[in-house]
Amino acid sequence: MRDHVEFCYYVIIYSLEKFQQRSKQFGISLFIFFLATAAVTVIVPTLLGVSQRGFFCDDDSIRYEYRKDTITAVQLMLYNLVLNAATVLFVEYYRMQKVESNINNPRYRWRNNHLHVLFVRLLTYFGYSQIGFVMNIALNIVTKHVVGRLRPHFLDVCKLANDTCVTGDSHRYITDYTCTGPPELVLEARKSFYSGHSAVSLYCATWSALYIQARLGPVLNNRIVVPISQTLMFMIGLGISFSRITDNKHHWSDVLVGIFIGIFLAVYTCTFWTDLFSNNSTESETQPLLLPRPPRTPRNSEDEERHRLDAVLPSTDSSIVFEATGPQDSDTILLPVPQSA
């Protein structure tokens, strides 16, 4: 978990520190964000531990057998990385080839090296997607430790002592009990609420679907490709979520809450971090950048008078139009130097 947090931090810093005029301020904000997230993810579980909840002896919802994961945690991480990265790569490549082929794309530099605009966009948008992913993981870990809900297979891995539920009152709530099963399985069996697989899979599906809608929907003539792609993403995400029920890892309510949290975090990330649906982020890639022509150097008395008037009332008709895409920042776009008349 800590390795993934560090990876996300360096990816975003690398992609943004030289590409925006506010790179230093933004980098500091990201550093504080990931530092706080990592601290919460590590410190809170260590201090609080997992909540030790009791159970009813006749509770059939925690008597299911233990099964292995259909989708492991490693596979879930790969799903997140591949889906988001492949989506950004395909969409941005299509835009560059079909939509922006006649537009001068901005040139980017990092440590005196030129970077391709596709590489920059891939790191930028993918980095934004990982911000919400890290928030998702951190929130899930803290919630699991605080709530401590028992998984459906809890009794199967706990292996209670023989005298725990032998009394006549089967509906008695047990708080003092001892598990004789493997400690690592017993510990994991106390982390049912809420489903991390559901939250992550629906976060990735929702973020990718919104990204396609914002970046590809307005420029793609075919009205079938985008809905089909979005439907497939949600089908995969829901399939991963529902597998947690069939694997006896989560109750249905755990999966449902995970789905809603994943969707909410995806919408939040797209709106407030990635800023996909802002007019500024979409129009800046199609609008020309206007640079006022510098006033001419006076050569005689008439030119001196005209120069004085131009300095007071500069004409907008003499502007130089430079087509550019992407954020209009002086650190990211190398503009041609206008020549004096």
From Swiss-Prot:
Glycans are attached at residue 162. Its EC number is 3.1.3.-. Keywords: Glycoprotein, Hydrolase, Membrane, Transmembrane, Transmembrane helix. The chain crosses the membrane at residues 30-50, 71-91, 122-142, 223-243, 257-277. GO terms for molecular function: phosphatidate phosphatase activity. InterPro entries: P_Acid_Pase_2/haloperoxi_sf (IPR036938), P_Acid_Pase_2/haloperoxidase (IPR000326), PA_PP_rel (IPR043216). Residues 299-308 have a biased composition (Basic and acidic residues). GO terms for cellular component: plasma membrane. It is a multi-pass membrane protein. Residues 284-308, 322-341 are annotated as: Disordered. It is found in: Membrane. GO terms for biological process: phospholipid dephosphorylation; phospholipid metabolic process; signal transduction. Pfam families: PAP2. Its main location: membrane. PANTHER family: LIPID PHOSPHATE PHOSPHATASE (PTHR10165), PHOSPHOLIPID PHOSPHATASE HOMOLOG 1.2 HOMOLOG (PTHR10165:SF103). Belongs to the PA-phosphatase related phosphoesterase family. This is Phospholipid phosphatase homolog 1.2 homolog. It comes from Caenorhabditis elegans.
